[in-house]
Amino acid sequence: MGTHFHYRPFVRLGWVIMLLAVSASATAAQSKQAGPNAQDWRAIRHTIRRQIDAFQRDDAKTAFSYAAPSVRRQFRTPHEFLSMVRTGYSAVYRPRAFRFLDPFTVSGHVIQALEVVTQDDMVMTAYYIMERQSNGTWKIAACTLEASAARSV
């Protein structure tokens, strides 16, 4: 995990919160659309679950298909994307277990949190920033991992 932001889809939580706060006024002016409803949250969870399933099968093409357009432009190919996740984000690449936590929004940004147990039994929280596409589907725009002091039992 880097400590600086270079348009990376996976960044530290502090950077995510700072960027969301800075963009709050632009977001408010840009969209008056209602927040996600129960059906949206189910679709968001489905998207995240399917991407993690694809990571576990090393299915780069499918995993990449759940990434938002900005992420796809940055990594250009499914294999570049999978390589980045494999080397830097093993918690979501090969989780031992995960469970969805309560979702929330910050300044209009939709965030789904997951509690993730890593292969070495560390507990982490993954924050997925989701982006609604023009066709109504949800894509993953960013993810950040936050370590927990807890260990899995």
How would you name each of these model-derived features?
Residues 102-153:
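Exposed beta-sheet edge and beta->alpha loop/turn motif
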Residues 26-31, 68-74, 129-132:
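Charged, low-complexity, helix/coiled-coil-prone segments
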